[in-house]
Amino acid sequence: MAKEELLEMRGTVVELLPNAMFRVRLENDHEILGHTAGKMRKNRIRVLVGDEVLVELTPYDLTKGRITYRFMPGRGGPGGF
């Protein structure tokens, strides 16, 4: 089975929820539920309210996503974001 094409969008964390979940407002003003990716948990990368993040969404459920990158002020992002 081939891996489906993931959508990557930029957003801002607006709320911290239980069980390491976050409410993220995307650039297009939609709000989704997001969780941190495994590598972010492994490397103990903190995500706080107000952080700019990169979220992967599957085309099958556009209400949930995986936070894959936290943008740092003054630095570039992955892949030219």
UniProtKB/Swiss-Prot annotation:
<keyword id="KW-0396">Initiation factor</keyword>
<dbReference type="Pfam" id="PF01176">
    <property type="entry name" value="eIF-1a"/>
</dbReference>
<dbReference type="InterPro" id="IPR004368">
    <property type="entry name" value="TIF_IF1"/>
</dbReference>
<dbReference type="InterPro" id="IPR012340">
    <property type="entry name" value="NA-bd_OB-fold"/>
</dbReference>
<protein>
    <recommendedName>
        <fullName>Translation initiation factor IF-1 1</fullName>
    </recommendedName>
</protein>
<dbReference type="GO" id="GO:0003743">
    <property type="term" value="F:translation initiation factor activity"/>
</dbReference>
<comment type="function">
    <text>One of the essential components for the initiation of protein synthesis. Stabilizes the binding of IF-2 and IF-3 on the 30S subunit to which N-formylmethionyl-tRNA(fMet) subsequently binds. Helps modulate mRNA selection, yielding the 30S pre-initiation complex (PIC). Upon addition of the 50S ribosomal subunit IF-1, IF-2 and IF-3 are released leaving the mature 70S translation initiation complex.</text>
</comment>
<comment type="similarity">
    <text>Belongs to the IF-1 family.</text>
</comment>
<dbReference type="GO" id="GO:0005829">
    <property type="term" value="C:cytosol"/>
</dbReference>
<feature type="domain" description="S1-like">
    <location>
        <begin position="1"/>
        <end position="72"/>
    </location>
</feature>
<keyword id="KW-0963">Cytoplasm</keyword>
<dbReference type="GO" id="GO:0019843">
    <property type="term" value="F:rRNA binding"/>
</dbReference>
<comment type="subunit">
    <text>Component of the 30S ribosomal translation pre-initiation complex which assembles on the 30S ribosome in the order IF-2 and IF-3, IF-1 and N-formylmethionyl-tRNA(fMet); mRNA recruitment can occur at any time during PIC assembly.</text>
</comment>
<keyword id="KW-0648">Protein biosynthesis</keyword>
<dbReference type="InterPro" id="IPR003029">
    <property type="entry name" value="S1_domain"/>
</dbReference>
<keyword id="KW-0694">RNA-binding</keyword>
<dbReference type="InterPro" id="IPR006196">
    <property type="entry name" value="RNA-binding_domain_S1_IF1"/>
</dbReference>
<keyword id="KW-0699">rRNA-binding</keyword>
<dbReference type="GO" id="GO:0043022">
    <property type="term" value="F:ribosome binding"/>
</dbReference>
